[in-house]
């Protein structure tokens, strides 16, 4: 309960400072990260977490799933059709070039092995949706640029994700079972497409009608179904989440619109909780062990 109490206190402070953060360089994400660091086991000791703690992996998985699910919903059928234009160029050229440049920099400056450097590049190269949403909300930014960032930030996580999964498998050290890996990725995509398509068909049938207060919960229950089924069948949870979000946006605009505000809130809560936990894992000892080249790369 101590962990929940700390999260509630930091969340209340972040909400009260959110308007100031929106108008300045302050960041609610940094607030949670710093709070986790201060409350971690090496300082105040209120969050005595280790990388092996079950809450760390579970919360990180749920946070990434919810972010990918909501990110996928940024991209509708029209966006996919027109993605070959500016967003397509940003994805097909900008994303790989950024990945390559980041990997070279990580290898040259931080001294990481090439495989680890490419993993860092794959993780860092997609446009941060939080950064993109801050720009998209500004009316003084040209509409074409706002549309580019909105579509590109929605699609790039899904495109970079298979690269991250493959590199993680290769870095594990054991021989990669490419057939099993392909089956895992393919099953995740298939599940993420099939289940929302069926759910949209059911929702539009004349036998069912969703009342107002329950409208956001249909897509929420769909997300829970995809998460649990993917976990039970060993399909890739994250590709299933992203594919499901894109499919929902393509097959049912109503379902996407009903879920939008609620889904963004849920994803934000999971993301902030994950940042609090991540901050608790950063210790002064760890910071002292990082060489100057690591800070230069960061």
Language-model regions, residue ranges each:
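Transmembrane helical cores of multi-pass secondary ion antiporters/exchangers
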Residues: 1-298
